[in-house]
């Protein structure tokens, strides 16, 4: 009995492990067939999309052609001597009443016509006015140069001098913060 069971299991394993051709094709060929079916499916999908896109283009082209010709048809149907429809009223056209000028902003009341400004050249830069900070720096430089020229630096009284730059700059820094 054990021997018979081993034989059956051996045959089953052999059949499962060996690729048996089905309908004359091996298992590998069946796999290729499935792959080919997927690529064919993709091809058909792409064809369908391109056909749908082509139909949409034709539809839009036809629609645009109708829009362009509709204006021509509308103007050609109206004869030059035709009367207006009875429900329309002929109101006189008024251009600018006297009340309009009172309520308009200054921008719209300008009498001057618009003048185009000349294009600015990128090379030219506008000189700005020197700021307060620059003026202070210039004063410091002047006092420093005057201080060095007067010979106070060589006298050894640097810390006791009322115009000591290091003391004034320290005081300025403390005042700022």
UniProtKB/Swiss-Prot annotation:
Task: Give start-end of the signal peptide.
Answer: 1-24
Q: Where is this motif: Nuclear localization signal?
A: 108-129
Q: Name one GO cellular component term.
A: extracellular region
| Region (Important for receptor binding) residue spans | 57-68
Q: Where is the composition biased (Basic and acidic residues)?
A: 109-118
Instruction: State where composition is biased (Basic residues).
Output: 122-132
Could you tell me what this protein is called? Parathyroid hormone-related protein
Originating organism: Canis lupus familiaris
